[in-house]
Amino acid sequence: SMPDIDTDFDDEGRQKVIDYVVDKYGKEQVAQIVTYGTMAAKSSIKDVARVMDLPLSESNLLAKLVPDKPGTELNRCLHAPLTVKEGEKSLAEREGYQPEDIDNVKKLREIYKGNDLRAAVLHEAERLEGSIRNTGIHAAGIIIAPSDLTEIMPVATAKDSTLWVTQIEGSVIEEAGVLKMDFLGLKTLSILKTALELIKQNHGITIDLDLIPLDDAKTFNLYQRGETNATFQFESVGMQKHLRDLKPDKFADLIAMNALYRPGPMAYIPNFIERKHGRELIKYDLTVMEEILSDTYGITVYQEQVMLLSQKIAGFTKGDADVLRKAMGKKQKSVLDKMKAQFVSGAVKNGHPENVLEKVWTDWEAFAQYAFNKSHSTCYAYLAYQTAYLKAHYPGEYMSAVLNHAGSIDKI
């Protein structure tokens, strides 16, 4: 399949690129991509309650009983095991519900079993959950077709755009034979551009950001102090705390932190920090894993690491490894189950113990929930480093550029 092509431009440059693409290929061959919004657990309850004339106060109370965890499914709230494993994972295991969440789910189930209007609302909401509620336009996706799009797929006009909008969503659109690219407008690039102009104006210096050293002491001191306000990707309070503990001293540390600081992998940040400073033993399930995991102190952080390990341990081809990467990224359980058998048999042939392989695969399945690619993390860490470099060496000009692009008085 085609690679996933994401490109970032400064805010002003993005529209120029889109105009160029339209001019090169023709308006009939370029379109934006539709998005379909579906009814989630809480919204389905509120929508059904409104139609069935359940008072707003009762509707809100009903919706509040649904836990706030992202991805919560009403169907599982109403029917899945609460805390004991009974063939399928319980709400406590899979969703990670806390005792308070479980108590609310129990109340929800009691109402569901009743025969009043609230019960009727829950039954209808369960049936409608996942239905398409509205449409929108993908924030960055652009389609380029080899011929007139109307001959390939249904399209529509959009209220706020001169481009057509596809009626097939992005996850499957390439199967229609078109190229999908993401053109993102990134304010950070505009900030860098303005900062460089101010530095030239004030100091008579022209800086080429592609040539700045990646081991600059002043920049890493800024990271180690956690003084990263207004720098790209590293400005949150939580990240600043981790930076002060980590004390990064090489670019690879920034790449890893950029990948780890997200829901899911954040749990591994304390281990990453302790291992970097030698306060926690670095362990490898198999000795051959050290070569690939040593940069991240034995913790699997990137999709590329899994790809390389599957080739090294089980003799996967590059093609097999890429299928594994995609299955992890898209959480395709059926594909992962097939690849597990291939992985275990291939690794056993290479002399690795089956019980250890089971653990490795289980860890990878958990990793699949937050799998991140190193190439993306590297690009963003590089951009982040450029902002930190300018802040460390030219704080006045850099912060002026940040304020110029703040967009609102509240942000300033």
Predicted segments, located by residue:
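Noncatalytic, beta-rich nucleic-acid-contacting surfaces in large DNA/RNA-processing enzymes
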Residues: 1-412
